[in-house]
Amino acid sequence: MTKQRHLFTSESVTEGHPDKICDQISDSILDAILSKDANARVACETTVTTGLVLVAGEITTSTYVDIPKIVRETIQGIGYTRAKYGFDAETCAVLTSIDEQSADIAMGVDRALEAREGQMTDAEIEAIGAGDQGLMFGFACNETKELMPLPISLAHKLARRLTEVRKDETLEYLRPDGKTQVTVEYDENGKPVRVDTIVISTQHHPEITWEQIDRDLKEHVIKAVVPAELMDEETKFFINPTGRFVIGGPQGDAGLTGRKIIVDTYGGYARHGGGAFSGKDATKVDRSAAYAARYVAKNIVAAGLAEKAEVQLAYAIGVAKPVSISVDTFGTGKVSEEVLVELVRNNFDLRPAGIIKMLDLRRPIYKQTAAYGHFGRTDVDLPWERTDKAADLKEQAGL
């Protein structure tokens, strides 16, 4: 069947979006705990609404952290510092409801089923079983230098730039909440050729005109981020298309941890297993295995074994080894997918403890991932973005 030209759209949000506030609070608490207790078990959920933050979850740790203080510092860092924004770091109420991790779950995670049944020794690897059942996907493609799909890459860069011009006061009338969306046109060969549509909605001071916002965002945000050669006279721009965005943040919408899982990953370009990341320590395979799957997929593409690769991992609670590993190259593979799966098994330890060791995940590195995407980041050093396995994969594949 002949491929046709088509459009694909992805979105991102700024750090001041209500759901992203929650992700950042949850990961700030996680980082604070991990900085003192690397073996802590953390599952921390946050919700925000007008004047209120609720932090709930299960945390098992030997240390103490001041959760309300962390919450307020995080909100302040985002920029909600005045009551007229509808949400203020100093005056909002902070409620906490924290329990310990279930003993039933801990029993499966502390020593994996294989260790309990004598199939492997604790000395072989710290015998950590998966903290839950589930399926996770990782993806990479050669559309950008960071091996990410172009639509989500541009959407994240626009969202980050929107925050930069607010914080450095280039556009001092902007407020923290905002969203971006980019539609890319692909040719008959599936290659991105142009940007078709850009949508930006940003919270702003009530007295600023739409005309000024439109002019300023095109000049200081879009032109600064989107390569000129990707835009043409047919590219459409929708800047604050409702005409006004004054009420925003938690005053405009309640927020929850884990409600921006497509923004966090590949913008809908690849499949998603459904599990969120923020607030979870690395024994939760929702997070660690999704990072490992990205690491695997990125190294496959970096090795030139495929132009795009999607890796699926699946786990059973309390069992260390993945119950399945699959690779889909969408017809772009230089070797068969069976060969790729075998290469993955031989080069990556995808048991939870193996992932933690391979990617050094017991560190406070998570808050920086909680806005602007967990993958394809060039502004921070994330271990799952390394391509240090690519040369070995290429050699073993005989290419």
From Swiss-Prot:
Its main location: cytoplasm. It catalyses: L-methionine + ATP + H2O = S-adenosyl-L-methionine + phosphate + diphosphate. Binds 2 divalent ions per subunit. Binds 1 potassium ion per subunit. Mg(2+) binds at D19. This is S-adenosylmethionine synthase. GO terms for molecular function: ATP binding; magnesium ion binding; methionine adenosyltransferase activity. Its EC number is 2.5.1.6. Catalyzes the formation of S-adenosylmethionine (AdoMet) from methionine and ATP. The overall synthetic reaction is composed of two sequential steps, AdoMet formation and the subsequent tripolyphosphate hydrolysis which occurs prior to release of AdoMet from the enzyme. InterPro entries: ADOMET_SYNTHASE_CS, S-AdoMet_synt_C, S-AdoMet_synt_central, S-AdoMet_synt_N, S-AdoMet_synthetase, S-AdoMet_synthetase_sfam. Transmembrane segments: none annotated. It comes from Bacillus cytotoxicus (strain DSM 22905 / CIP 110041 / 391-98 / NVH 391-98). Its cofactor is Mg(2+); K(+). It comes from the Bacteria. L-methionine binds at E58, Q101, D253, K284. Belongs to the AdoMet synthase family. ATP binds at H17, D177, G178, K179, R244, F245, D253, R259, K260, A276, K280. Residues 101-111 are annotated as: Flexible loop. The gene is metK.
